[in-house]
């Protein structure tokens, strides 16, 4: 998947230096080449803000997004409450280069381990946020663990997971928790293929990012706040904002 290519991201970040841009917002990948590119932009006086996924680099102005550790903990809490019995739960992770996925997994595992020890968590690296990749991975999981009772998809590719669950005839009995409300996941909530969406309002992310960067450029004081973690089910879809 091209979204997981650090060299491409680093090249595009460096190209921003010659495009007359005043500031750059980006979704980071954990890779030395990306860190180097951000440091170079900082050297040119171009401020940068990380969005959606955390990034430990002193050159950035700040991070805008949800508390992803909290999002993972929320998913773990809901999984445990929806599955009050012993069983296996799978984590589908999009990729190791996004800190957001690491944070969500840590939060999820922490809550399951401390509050719901009767659940056995198995982890897979999944299909790198790809629909077909997640479909294949979910098919393998269902074949290997026929007693699987819950799935937490940390990243994208929800359509692939639902397709596999439906083909196996287990969508209605599987507890499935994923991220980001879209026209697809909205329908999955309505037909029962998904139980819960952990959501971040991307409109708020964009607005907060612009405020952060403009305040920095104008040397104004800016009090940054985290974007709220939203929990969406089929019962509170009305008025919910898509990603």
Tell where the protein language model's regions lie, with residue ranges.
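A conserved helix-loop-strand patch within extracytoplasmic ligand-binding domains
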Residues: 71-89
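Hinge/cleft segment of the Venus flytrap/periplasmic-binding protein
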Residues: 112, 204-243
């Amino acid at each position: 998947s091209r979204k997981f290519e650090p060299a491409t991201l680093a090249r595009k970040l460096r190209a921003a230096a010659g495009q007359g841009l005043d500031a750059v917002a980006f979704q980071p990948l954990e890779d030395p080449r990306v860190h180097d590119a951000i440091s170079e932009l900082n050297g040119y006086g171009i401020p940068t803000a990380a969005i959606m996924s955390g990034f430990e680099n002193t050159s950035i102005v700040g991070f805008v997004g949800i508390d992803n550790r909290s999002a993972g903990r929320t998913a773990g809490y809901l999984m445990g409450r929806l599955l009050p019995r012993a069983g296996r739960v799978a984590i589908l992770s999009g990729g190791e280069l996004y800190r957001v996925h690491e944070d969500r997994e840590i939060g999820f595992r922490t809550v399951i381990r401390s509050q719901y020890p009767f659940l056995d968590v198995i982890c897979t690296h999944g299909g790198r946020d790809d629909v077909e990749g997640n479909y294949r991975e979910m098919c393998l999981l269902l074949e290997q663990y026929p007693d699987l009772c819950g799935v937490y998809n940390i990243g994208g590719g929800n359509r692939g997971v639902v397709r596999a669950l439906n083909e196996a005839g287990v969508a209605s009995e599987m507890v499935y928790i994923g991220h980001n409300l879209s026209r697809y996941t909205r329908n999955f909530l309505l037909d029962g293929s998904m139980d819960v969406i952990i959501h971040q309002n991307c409109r708020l992310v964009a607005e907060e990012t612009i405020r952060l960067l403009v305040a920095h450029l104008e040397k104004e004081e800016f009090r940054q706040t985290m974007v709220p973690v939203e929990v969406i089910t089929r019962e509170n879809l009305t008025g919910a904002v898509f990603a």
